[in-house]
From Swiss-Prot:
It is found in: Secreted. Heterohexamer; disulfide linked. Contains 2 sets of 3 non-identical chains (alpha, beta and gamma). The 2 heterotrimers are in head to head conformation with the N-termini in a small central domain. This is Fibrinogen alpha chain. GO terms for biological process: adaptive immune response; blood coagulation; innate immune response.
């Protein structure tokens, strides 16, 4: 989710 990699589709943590 909020990983900052590619799980931006979960909540918005990933920018890429």
């Amino acid at each position: 989710a909020d990983t900052g990699e590619g799980e931006f589709l979960a909540e918005g943590g990933g920018v890429r």
